[in-house]
Amino acid sequence: MYPSKNIIENAVNSKDHTTLVAAVKAAGLVGTLSGPGPFTVFAPDNRAFDKLPDGTVPMLLKPENKGKLTGILTYHVVPGRLSAEDLWKMVDDNGGKAELKTANGQTLWIKRVSDKHLAVWDAKGHAGRITISNVMQSNGVIHVIDNVVQPN
């Protein structure tokens, strides 16, 4: 990925994010995530989508499920550019967890899961560990996670 390119320009060239790109296209979010931002994206990789129950991804990609898909995807986006260092500071300053307001208006939590790792938690108690952090983009930053987190 190239820091001079935006989130979408980089994601479409990532072999590990083909499912995410297909979902972003189906939800009509390409224009938004190509915009100036800045955005912090907690980006599930293909393996994260593979962990969902069989048939979930094809079902979400159907036009009639665009609203649900948009809600899930925007739950992975936080306004602003939050580096791993920013996330660690927020977690350390708040007793081991930090609350983030997502682009869909709901809350995600960042929690320490070890001395070296943070995870993103949803309201249902599901977590996506940050496996790759600080993938800088012209309009934000991507942190790759190993599970799809879901809004209420």
Residue ranges, per PLM feature:
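Mature, structured domains of secreted/extracytosolic soluble proteins
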Residues: 1-152
